[in-house]
């Protein structure tokens, strides 16, 4: 049971925010208060509902001592015994510390791994899956860079996805995705295994990551197309190396050097921000023990088996026999929701261990 003082402190904060919003405050302060208000409002409502039911339970226990009311009180207690655990659980989930990046937009990177042309085709399948899922969520997808495979698909594709709660939903997609199927180039009908790597990076603002000019090496060169031939006569392509971390980003998809540099800096900032978050996560690894996956890019997280039309997420041992619907982006939400639920359960258990 959540201590009442913990619940009352949330309601007190909600009322304080509400009161301050009604006073004369600077615009930037009002914007910050409005954001906090919108986050606290559903939590305060759920807590109010829970506290009301707790009071009803206490009243019913008192009525047990009144002979004429005892039977009705027993029925009331039985009803509340069913309702209260559900309400407690809902409020517990709402009180879990939020990942500060959950509301951020993301940079999605999909790269072909082992498997040559087939891996590039699979990388294309994965990107389209995320594109369709994003469309169903009402999010916006903007292509940043793409290197196409010789037989289709992508050797690498990078896109920005923006909308409410993007990182919260997609953050568990990072890792190695494996496919088992008969490639279009396979005449003997043998099943091959290929892989693609997905990275979901929360988009970083300049205030999140301080990058000094002295820490950058910027090289410019002529953009090249398939086969290595130069596709323009100006040095519009940009490669930026962040010397302290060794992170390198190259960008040539835009026609102007200025735009390519801006794109490269956007990706670089996100990668540095993500690397710092990973470092902090490792330092908190004891607290994170048991949570969904490690976020390790080399961790095999999911297998897509075409002959059996199944998708298995290895982190939570969940198998769906609806591969087509997953790749269409329709059933991907079932996997994502299950991963979020598992993560919440693990964090609740960790909070219980600490209590």
Swiss-Prot record:
Gene3D superfamilies: 3.30.160.20, 3.30.70.1660, 6.10.140.1950. GO terms for cellular component: cytoplasm. The modification N5-methylglutamine is found at residue 229. Methylated by PrmC. Methylation increases the termination efficiency of RF1. The keyword Protein biosynthesis applies. It is found in: Cytoplasm. Residues 280-299 are annotated as: Disordered. GO terms for molecular function: translation release factor activity, codon specific. Belongs to the prokaryotic/mitochondrial release factor family. This is Peptide chain release factor 1. It comes from Parvibaculum lavamentivorans (strain DS-1 / DSM 13023 / NCIMB 13966). The gene is prfA.
């Amino acid at each position: 049971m959540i201590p009442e003082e913990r619940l009352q402190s949330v309601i007190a904060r909600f009322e304080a925010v509400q009161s301050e919003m009604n006073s004369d405050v600077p615009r930037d302060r009002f914007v910050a208060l409005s954001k906090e208000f919108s986050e606290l409002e559903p939590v305060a409502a759920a807590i109010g509902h829970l506290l009301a039911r707790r009071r009803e339970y206490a009243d019913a226990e008192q009525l047990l001592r009144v002979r004429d009311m005892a039977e009705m009180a027993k029925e009331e207690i039985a009803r509340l015994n069913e309702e209260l655990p559900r309400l407690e659980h809902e409020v517990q989930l709402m009180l879990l510390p939020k990942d500060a990046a959950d509301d951020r937009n993301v940079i999605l990177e999909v790269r072909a791994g082992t498997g040559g042309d087939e891996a590039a085709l699979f990388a294309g399948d994965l990107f389209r899956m995320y594109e369709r899922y994003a469309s169903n969520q009402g999010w916006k997808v903007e292509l940043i860079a793409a290197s196409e495979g010789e037989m289709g698909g992508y050797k690498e594709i990078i896109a920005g996805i923006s909308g409410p709660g993007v990182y919260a939903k997609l953050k568990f997609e990072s890792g190695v995705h494996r496919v088992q199927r008969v490639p279009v180039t396979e005449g003997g009908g043998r099943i091959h295994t290929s892989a693609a790597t997905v990275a979901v990076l929360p988009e970083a603002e300049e205030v999140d990551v301080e990058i000094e000019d002295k820490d950058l090496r910027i090289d410019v060169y002529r953009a090249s197309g398939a086969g290595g031939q130069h596709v323009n006569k100006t040095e519009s392509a940009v490669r930026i190396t962040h010397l302290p971390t060794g992170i390198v980003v190259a960008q040539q998809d835009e026609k102007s050097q200025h735009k390519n540099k801006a794109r490269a800096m956007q990706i670089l900032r996100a990668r540095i921000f993500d690397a710092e978050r990973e470092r902090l996560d490792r330092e908190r690894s004891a607290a994170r023990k048991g949570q969904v996956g490690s976020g390790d890019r080399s961790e095999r997280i999911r297998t897509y088996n075409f002959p059996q039309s199944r998708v298995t997420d290895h982190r939570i041992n969940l198998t769906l026999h609806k591969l087509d619907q997953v790749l269409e982006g329709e059933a991907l939400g079932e996997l994502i929701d299950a991963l979020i639920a598992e993560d919440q359960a693990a964090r609740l258990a960790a909070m219980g261990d600490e209590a």
